[in-house]
Amino acid sequence: MTKYETVIGLEVHVQLDTKSKMFCRCSTDYASAEPNTHVCPVCLGMPGVLPTINKQAVEYTIMSGLALGCDIAPFTKFDRKNYAYPDLMKGYQISQYDQPLCGKGFLDINVDGVIRRIGITRIHLEEDVAKLHHESDINGQPYSLLDINRSSIPLMEVVSEPDMRTPEEARQYLMKLRTIMRYLGVSTANMEEGSFRCDANISIRPVGATELGAKVEVKNMNSFKAVFSALEYEEVRQRKMADEGKKISQETRGWQDEKCQTVSQRSKEFAHDYRYFPEPDLPPLHISCDWIEDIRAKLPELPETRKERFINGYWLSEYDASLLTASRELADYFEAVLGETDFQNIPQDKGVKEVANWVVGSVNSIMNTGGADITAFALKVSPASLCHLLVLVSAGKVNAATAKAVLEDMYATGQNAEAIIEKKGLSQISDSSELVAIAKKVLADNPKAVAEYNEGKTQVIGFLVGQMMKQSKGRANPNIAMELLKKALEEG
């Protein structure tokens, strides 16, 4: 049994998906723009200019706070965070220090079937910094270029309590938080693109102790896997140092993905190192109860609530419901297909399960193979088109295996199912006379399997059905094929 307990807290920076920057009207579409084109005197930090607060960013932060059960402050203000770094255009960052927009909240995560409640310390608003590009000249000498397009993009920082005890809990927390941000529509929350960034604070202490150990901040993690690996590495490193009687320094370390290790970058700063003071160019904000309730009324159904509805209302398993609600767009697509479905000829629970199987299985498989999301998929295969394909399967016009290939063609070409089936001659063969001829040939070609069946090894019927499917190029109705084979074998 381990002597140490790991303590992890996360600071997550979420780029808000607003059209303009936090304190000016410059566009936030910096990713596809030429460097240093979406700039103005305000985000350049020129003397004498005055910032103005982006109302949409404030509303997005309140919305996020409500979704995470936070207390929304009736009074909040901005502060100057002072530090020297080349990507900080003003020489300070406009942030929030002692009076953040959102206070205490929580996020529940499920790890191996156990629900863990992770506390949220605060959520505050600030501006992003410019982006440094590190290059080398023809002689191998390093130099850096500065792209100011990202400077002053609205940034929301979600700070957790140090409530996580394993790297896996940290990963689950991040994944759940990202899903909520995407459901709310406040951010694309893409780690690889930098719109969802995480710094982790990790320490160890003897099991049973209540006082926190020396805190190490880990940076430069741009994927969920990197966060997990960095924390796992740091956990092992710190425990080894403690076992060897070495002092663990409070410092900032960077994750090196290619070497799978953390390296020391600098000593960890304290709040007083930043010399915070109130931002003199921005008035405090008074958040009225009416404003909060207006925003609350706009909240969408959140993933956990939607998952419970799918389980209780659609009779889905927790596994299927979790997969379907992992993305708001995927859940919307699933419900849109259901809305097109006529359950008159089949039990509703069976029909819902069939739709869920197709969306979770075949649709997800096509998206993963093609690197597309459900929005792109729906442009080629609308909910009505998928529903029509399932109707053809239910009516026996095409079998399930062939239908999966048809769905792939529908996505590739944008054509409807019937056109593809007719063009490629994929209609299911349900005519008994035609299938009897195929069955006779299969039995004649496989005397060993016939002998095994007659000896009581009835499981070989599956092999024989497979041979009929092969002979018919996947068009044989598998249920009728099995009946005909059994009848022929019983009759000898």
Swiss-Prot record:
The keyword Hydrolase does not apply. HAMAP family: GatB. This is Aspartyl/glutamyl-tRNA(Asn/Gln) amidotransferase subunit B. InterPro entries: Asn/Gln-tRNA_amidoTrfase_suB/E (IPR017959), Asn/Gln-tRNA_Trfase_suB/E_cat (IPR006075), Asn/Gln_amidotransferase (IPR018027), Asn/Gln_tRNA_amidoTrase-B-like (IPR003789), GatB (IPR004413), GatB_C_1 (IPR042114), GatB_Yqey_C_2 (IPR023168), Gln-tRNA_amidoTrfase_suB_CS (IPR017958). GO terms for biological process: glutaminyl-tRNAGln biosynthesis via transamidation; translation. The gene is gatB. Its EC number is 6.3.5.-. It comes from Dehalococcoides mccartyi (strain CBDB1). The keyword Thylakoid does not apply. Disulfide bonds: none annotated. It catalyses: L-glutamyl-tRNA(Gln) + L-glutamine + ATP + H2O = L-glutaminyl-tRNA(Gln) + L-glutamate + ADP + phosphate + H(+); L-aspartyl-tRNA(Asn) + L-glutamine + ATP + H2O = L-asparaginyl-tRNA(Asn) + L-glutamate + ADP + phosphate + 2 H(+). Keywords: ATP-binding, Ligase, Nucleotide-binding, Protein biosynthesis. GO terms for molecular function: asparaginyl-tRNA synthase (glutamine-hydrolyzing) activity; ATP binding; glutaminyl-tRNA synthase (glutamine-hydrolyzing) activity. Allows the formation of correctly charged Asn-tRNA(Asn) or Gln-tRNA(Gln) through the transamidation of misacylated Asp-tRNA(Asn) or Glu-tRNA(Gln) in organisms which lack either or both of asparaginyl-tRNA or glutaminyl-tRNA synthetases. The reaction takes place in the presence of glutamine and ATP through an activated phospho-Asp-tRNA(Asn) or phospho-Glu-tRNA(Gln). It comes from the Bacteria. Heterotrimer of A, B and C subunits. It is an enzyme of class 6 (ligase). Gene3D superfamilies: 1.10.10.410, GatB domain, N-terminal subdomain (1.10.150.380).
